[in-house]
Curated annotation (Swiss-Prot):
NDH-1 shuttles electrons from NADH, via FMN and iron-sulfur (Fe-S) centers, to quinones in the respiratory chain. The immediate electron acceptor for the enzyme in this species is believed to be ubiquinone. Couples the redox reaction to proton translocation (for every two electrons transferred, four hydrogen ions are translocated across the cytoplasmic membrane), and thus conserves the redox energy in a proton gradient. This subunit may bind ubiquinone. GO terms for biological process: aerobic respiration. The gene is nuoH. PANTHER family: NADH DEHYDROGENASE SUBUNIT 1 (PTHR11432), NADH-UBIQUINONE OXIDOREDUCTASE CHAIN 1 (PTHR11432:SF3). It is a multi-pass membrane protein. Keywords: Cell inner membrane, Cell membrane, Membrane, NAD, Quinone, Translocase, Transmembrane, Transmembrane helix, Ubiquinone. GO terms for cellular component: plasma membrane; respiratory chain complex I. It comes from the Bacteria. It catalyses: a quinone + NADH + 5 H(+)(in) = a quinol + NAD(+) + 4 H(+)(out). It is found in: Cell inner membrane. This is NADH-quinone oxidoreductase subunit H. One of its GO terms (molecular function) is quinone binding. It holds the Pfam family NADHdh.
């Protein structure tokens, strides 16, 4: 009797696909830290890191070695268990969100019928990492950063979900593969342009990226919620932020730009090229926009983005009802 039954082989292949996809995402998130510094140098007419390896290509390895050998210090006045749990949540929450993204017609970690709801759930879970880090550090700057993060995430996740409801209504499904297949003739970015705009803005805010990096504003909060972190714990926060950028870029491509669809090239290549474009856009936004005040960030979310999202949803519903007659 052979142990390798067809069912077991199918399970092993699925596990192998999941491991490969998630390892590629983690690797892209790590290398994006080097790519961001080089691109920021290009945008600002300077060199960026260029000393370690050819053209600075080994800078990431040097940073990893440095973080690995730094003291893993835990403040005596902190809550050790929650202090340690926070970076793990920050690293895994948005990484697991990538599980629903189909990178080709046959490659996806999980083909869920509630794919979009799963992403919204994991995005909501990510804020707990910031709250835990701010509270467990027992530091006033960390706590202020955590409070900012909770208010900002509460505000922007409202229209993060609403911006996707137009896409769901057009596709008739929460499944990511169904949404990609529904864009065979026209990408969702055309009928759902305002939904795309608000989702992209909310995605930047959920990743706590500039100009929505209020929870870790260096000039105001001395690096905010991870001021007490060092070594690999800080590294998990650091890489987790870039994994969030990769995940949000991949979701923008999947939901609004046809996912892996495209002529001539293999589906995975199309998906990678589209995702890389939006990852570069994240860096360009950081290089070109100033950081607004915290009250301006909140006002922009509630007074501009939320009404725009509701109008887009109402217009989409009206068009669908008109076409159904």
């Amino acid at each position: 009797m052979s142990w390798f039954t067809p069912e077991l082989i199918e399970i092993l292949i699925s596990v192998l696909k999941a491991v490969v996809i998630l390892l590629v995402v983690v690797t892209c998130g790590a290398f994006m830290s080097f790519g961001e510094r080089r691109l920021l140098g290009l945008f600002q007419n300077r060199y960026g890191p260029n000393r370690v390896g050819w053209g600075g290509s080994l800078q990431l390895v040097a940073d990893m070695i440095k973080m690995f050998f730094k003291e893993d210090w835990v403040p005596r006045f902190s809550d050790r268990a929650i202090f340690t749990l926070a970076p793990v949540i920050a690293f895994t929450s948005l990484l697991l969100s990538f599980a629903i993204v189909p990178v080709s017609p046959t490659w996806a970690v999980a083909d869920l019928n509630i794919g979009i709801l799963f992403f919204l759930m994991m995005a909501g879970l990510a804020v707990y990492a910031v709250l835990f880090a701010g509270w467990a550090s027992n530091n006033k700057y960390s706590l202020l950063g955590a409070m900012r993060a909770s208010a900002q995430t509460l505000s922007y996740e409202v229209f993060l979900g609403l911006s996707l409801m137009g896409v769901v209504a057009q596709a008739g499904s929460f499944n990511m593969q169904d949404i990609v297949n529904s864009q065979e003739h026209v990408w969702n970015v055309i009928p759902q342009f305002f939904g795309f705009l608000t989702f992209a803005i909310a995605g930047v805010a959920v990743c706590h990226r500039h100009p929505f990096d209020q929870p870790e504003a260096e000039q105001e909060l001395a690096d905010g919620y991870h001021i007490e972190y060092s070594g690999m714990k800080f590294g998990l926060f650091f890489v987790g932020e870039y994994i969030g950028i990769v995940t949000v870029s991949a979701l923008i491509v999947t939901l609004f730009f046809g996912g892996w669809q495209g002529p001539f090239l293999p589906p995975f290549i199309w998906f990678a090229l589209k995702t890389a474009f939006f990852m570069v856009m994240f860096i360009l936004i950081r290089a070109s926009l100033p950081r607004p005040r915290y009250d301006q960030v909140m006002s922009f979310g509630w007074k501009v983005c939320l009404p725009l999202t509701l109008l887009n949803l109402l217009a989409t519903a009206a068009v669908i009802l008109y076409n159904a007659q």
